[in-house]
Amino acid sequence: MEIDKTKVLEAGKIASQVKTYARTIVKKDVPLLEIAEKIEARISELGGKPAFPVNLSINEIAAHYTPSHDDKALASGLLKVDFGVHIDGWTADNAFSLDLENSEENKRLIETAEEALNKALDIVKLDIAANQIGGVISETIESRGFSPIINLCGHSMKQYELHGGITIPNIDDGRKVVLKEGLYAIEPFATPGSGKVRDGRPSGIYELTSEKSPRSPLARELLQFIKKEYDKLPFCSRWIVEALDSKALFGLRELEANGNLHHFNQLVEVSGAKVSQAEQTILVEENKVTVTTL
């Protein structure tokens, strides 16, 4: 399928505006639920839709923390803000990190991830090998005394598919997969720790993987709602409660047990060390590369 460049660029423009807005509302001790709801509302106000639930991951949690509908957690520490915007399934994915405890190490980690991202963006072109990008990322991060997260990667994106099949590693993994024309997210993670993540607690973030019919009418109705509202893009239990009610959580559990949904885990740095993240989306064309989320 041919990329709808107009929608890709518009999604990126909205993401950029929301990123500027998000930086103004994220403060220490603000409820994460409030931050997520405000970011998602701003996306909708500007004419887009959230491509996935806002991730607000603190310290050693590298990714996949989104507030539940009754979440009480407050913003603190080294906070990663990762959100996406889509227009008819064409996505802009971006992230930034904030130091909410005035820590020199946090600031260095944030600067390191941003520098690694910028150096990666500088070399991206049509037909570049993804592992070459990963090599630049790891060299940059390691030169500042930190480690890249080796089992988290950037990714290609397709319409209604956040992960489109091609990965962009954060190290030189030796796999010479080249970037063709398309949409990609590049996202370095830096840590003073071991440089790997493990599965943590269930995140409340889901993705539709099968349309086989469940038993109960409640679950069947919820399955149709998910297909219509989210297609193959990730969603969360909080959205389901907001759109329907808390009874729908029973249907969600049934769909998970029936194999209709993949339930993502939070991703936690193995040694318990803090993690920073930076991310932008790029559109690779024959003669140019556009960072859509700037």
Predicted regions and their residues:
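Active-site neighborhoods and metal-handling regions in enzymes and metal-associated proteins
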Residues: 1-294
